[in-house]
């Protein structure tokens, strides 16, 4: 978390990343709001299960419940960043793209067994760094 820049980098954590989300700026109160399905939950307004992290201010899109689907969203986000960097004529890009942004994604062992994770490795044109604990 120390090397990530919330609000600049794009963050796609999975449900076990509570400590990471706290370190990046999700507050304990916001986590509480998510756990009780409160309409003031910044991730999804109480429409998602707890621990489906998301926060607009931190560039952390809301996640789906299906295991591994956020892998595809993360690669799409990374490819959009590559296009924004290559095509300065894209309108409305201010605030959406930073030249040094990265896209962070984490998945668990179960997620690596899903076909979506394999497809991500196969289609990603942006650099992909896989780290195993």
Report the location of each language-model feature.
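Cofactor-binding active-site loop characterized by glycine-rich and histidine/acidic residues
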Residues: 1-132
């Amino acid at each position: 978390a120390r090397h990530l820049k919330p609000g600049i980098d794009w963050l796609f954590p999975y449900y076990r990343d509570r400590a990471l989300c706290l370190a990046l700026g999700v507050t304990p109160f916001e986590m509480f709001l998510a756990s009780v399905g409160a309409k003031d939950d910044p991730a999804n307004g109480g429409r998602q299960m707890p621990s489906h992290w998301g926060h607009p201010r931190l560039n952390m899109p809301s996640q789906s419940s299906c295991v591994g689907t956020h892998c595809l969203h993360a690669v799409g986000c990374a490819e959009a960043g590559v296009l924004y960097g290559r095509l300065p004529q894209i309108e409305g890009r201010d605030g959406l793209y930073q030249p040094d942004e990265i896209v962070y994604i984490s998945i668990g062992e179960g997620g690596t067994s899903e076909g979506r994770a394999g497809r991500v490795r196969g289609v990603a044109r942006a650099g992909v760094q896989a780290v195993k604990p």
